[in-house]
């Protein structure tokens, strides 16, 4: 009942956001055609997994940074499963765990929206997608920074989503002001102590990195302060038996001085309870990664955007109450000790951290598609794979997308544009397209004749753009942030012309505490595949899978198709499906367009300097002043606010109408 009500309310709100008719501005568009949607018509994966998963004493399925991608990837073959397919897979895997007499836990590390039309077409974001997400029965969940930027979203998470999961939604260092009492309280539980189905005693803490970009109704406690709090120390030192500590949350699995959260918790727990195994799960940086901390503690990171499902298995945990199988029969078992570079069963001398403790691990990164899920779910065929619950979720996703008009076609993209598969200067680089968009549609009408420079940070672009129908969904996917442009009028051109270079030599412009700009990458036959830009982390750990267009051709099953190629502390064999590597080219921090410059080739004396609001006061003003300007935030004025629309939509409605209504992908 709640889902149908939510969809109806969201559809009513979405109607106000519908685009104008392409031929008659001001008249709502009436595109009947929906682009190829997820669910049964989704593109099938080309390559099956390399072999069965290892099953241990305790096993984990791990998701993170789904960002609303519950429909799956409509145009990417390797990520074609939707949340209903995943739900069916979870049921099969839990049944398999029961047959093997082992434990299986589901863990999610937050960031549930901002990046897809299904999650971002509602107000607040996530009203529909959170309800669909919550139909999968997770054992542990944590909060992400994208749940805290906007006050309405934070309260939606607190009032509804957290209540669905109860004590399983763990927010050890995140609090919110209760509207009724005016006091801070934890959004979820502070910790969770529980016993697994087969008797393991587990203590779990769920954390967010030291985030400072939250709205003023919430509070994030720094990890260094958290571990000194009496309740945390008491929980770690509980007189109850603890066989395994789980520390998980929205923070990178691979720790450093910038993101020390998991390291801080691990070290404190080891100080108070030496010898007890610690398993960590991370997210936020959108990468596949497995990290060996020491002989009894490792961490798993499982990508982003419903592209990756992480798998981890462990064997060797000492427990007086465990009544399952340490080494289940009929399936491979974990064999690797927690030693960096341990690509095979270790034969080197090993110092047991605790008498009788010999932990063995296995990890795998699963591509998010039905072929992968069916293969690992006892090699089920499609008819056997689908569950009634999974089919209902699939149906509801399809219905919600229709009601929210996310498949409404706004234009026909003439070519495929990627973020980093080709050099920045190449015509098929998406930033060259965005530069053209800025020049043509971002204009203050009463100053249209004034020469202008327009700046945008590349981190705001989150996805590639494939040739074919451009939908409302694509609008959210490519650039999910609000489009408010500001400006400084009549800036001396002698200063303004130096600004782009100064910004690109300056600090990286993360969206508040964002780790780095990330986006799944696409390709066509004419454009090479590409990974996500990771300007800060130039030592890449993987390259995301590109979209391969719909074509009628013979598939060579022996080929390696482009996708993730991951290197982690266990080596190069973590990817469940083998892929070929993908090219990667760096991108600048900011891009610039110019418009209304003198037609005779001369340079203007002054220009209007426009920029997206995110970079204005924090980056543009300081950079201008270093170049000799004398500006303050109070000098910034509104230039153009696209409101519920976007510069992408405006561009599509004006320049991408050729080929409609029969626009096809490749």
From Swiss-Prot:
The keyword DNA damage does not apply. Induction: Expression is up-regulated in presence of human keratinocytes. One of its GO terms (molecular function) is hydrolase activity. One of its GO terms (biological process) is nucleotide catabolic process. Residues 1-18 form the signal peptide. The keyword Transmembrane helix does not apply. Glycans are attached at residues 160, 216, 342, 405, 594, 600, 662. CDD domains: MPP_YHR202W_N. Keywords: Glycoprotein, Secreted, Signal. It is found in: Secreted. Pfam families: Metallophos (PF00149), NadN_nucleosid_C (PF21953). One of its GO terms (cellular component) is extracellular region. Residues 323-353 are annotated as: Disordered. This is Secreted protein ARB_01864. It comes from Arthroderma benhamiae (strain ATCC MYA-4681 / CBS 112371) (Trichophyton mentagrophytes).
């Amino acid at each position: 009942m709640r889902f149908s009500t939510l969809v109806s309310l969201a559809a009513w709100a979405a109607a106000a956001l519908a685009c104008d008719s392409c031929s008659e501005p001001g008249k709502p568009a009436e595109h009947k055609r929906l682009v190829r949607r997820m669910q049964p018509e989704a593109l099938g994966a080309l390559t099956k997994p390399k072999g069965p998963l290892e099953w241990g004493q305790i096993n984990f399925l791990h998701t993170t940074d789904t960002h609303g991608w519950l429909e799956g990837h409509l145009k990417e073959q390797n990520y074609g499963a939707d949340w209903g397919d995943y739900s069916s897979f979870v049921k099969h895997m839990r049944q398999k765990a029961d047959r093997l007499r082992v434990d299986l836990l589901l863990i999610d590390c937050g960031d549930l929206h901002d990046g897809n039309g299904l999650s971002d077409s509602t107000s607040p974001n996530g009203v529909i997608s959170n309800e669909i997400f919550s139909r999968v029965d997770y054992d542990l969940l944590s909060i992400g920074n994208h749940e805290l930027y906007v006050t309405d979203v934070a309260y939606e998470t607190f009032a509804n989503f957290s209540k669905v999961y109860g004590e399983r939604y763990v927010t050890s260092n995140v609090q919110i002001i209760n509207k009724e009492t005016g006091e801070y309280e934890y959004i979820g539980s502070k910790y969770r102590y529980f016993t697994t189905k087969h008797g393991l005693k587990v203590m779990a803490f769920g954390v967010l990195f030291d985030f400072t970009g939250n709205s003023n109704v919430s509070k994030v406690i720094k990890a260094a302060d958290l571990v000194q709090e009496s309740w945390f120390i008491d929980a770690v030192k509980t007189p109850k038996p603890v066989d395994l500590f789980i520390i998980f949350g929205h923070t990178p699995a691979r720790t450093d001085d910038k993101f020390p959260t998991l390291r801080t918790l691990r070290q404190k727990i080891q100080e108070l309870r030496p010898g007890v195994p610690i398993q960590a799960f991370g997210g936020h940086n959108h990468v596949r990664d497995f990290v060996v901390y020491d002989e009894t503690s490792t961490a798993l990171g499982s990508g982003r955007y419903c592209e990756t499902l992480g798998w981890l298995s462990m064997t060797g945990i000492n427990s007086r109450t465990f009544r399952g199988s340490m080494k289940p029969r009929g399936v491979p078992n974990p064999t690797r000790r927690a030693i960096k570079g341990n690509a095979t069963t270790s034969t080197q001398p090993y110092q047991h951290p605790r008498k009788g403790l010999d932990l063995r691990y296995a990890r795998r990164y699963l591509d998010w598609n039905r072929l992968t899920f069916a293969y690992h779910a006892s090699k089920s065929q499609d008819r056997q794979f689908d569950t009634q619950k999974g089919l209902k979720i699939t149906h509801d996703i399809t219905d919600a997308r229709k009601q929210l008009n996310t498949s409404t076609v706004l234009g026909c993209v003439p070519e495929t544009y990627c973020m980093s598969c080709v050099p920045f200067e190449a015509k098929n680089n998406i930033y060259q397209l965005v530069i053209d968009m800025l020049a043509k549609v971002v204009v203050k009408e009463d100053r249209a004749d004034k020469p202008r420079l327009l700046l945008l940070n590349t981190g705001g672009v989150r996805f590639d753009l494939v040739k074919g129908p451009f939908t409302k969904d694509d609008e959210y996917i490519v650039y999910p942030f609000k489009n408010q442009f500001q400006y400084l009028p009549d800036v001396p051109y002698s200063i303004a012309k130096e600004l782009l270079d100064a910004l690109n030599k300056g600090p990286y412009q993360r969206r508040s505490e964002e780790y780095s700009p990330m986006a799944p990458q696409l390709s066509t036959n004419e454009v090479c595949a590409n990974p996500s830009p990771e300007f800060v982390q130039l030592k890449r750990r993987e390259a995301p899978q590109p979209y391969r267009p719909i074509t009628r051709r013979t598939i060579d099953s022996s080929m390696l198709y482009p996708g993730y190629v991951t290197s982690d502390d266990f080596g190069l064999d973590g990817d469940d499906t083998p892929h070929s590597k993908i090219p990667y080219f760096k991108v600048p921090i900011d891009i610039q367009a110019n418009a209304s410059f003198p037609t005779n080739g001369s340079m203007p004396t002054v220009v209007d300097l426009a920029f997206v609001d995110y970079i204005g006061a924090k980056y543009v003003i300081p950079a201008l002043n270093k170049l000799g300007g004398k500006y303050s935030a109070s000098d910034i004025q509104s230039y153009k606010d696209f409101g519920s629309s976007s510069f992408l939509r405006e561009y599509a409605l004006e320049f991408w109408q050729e080929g409609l209504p029969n626009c096809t992908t490749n």
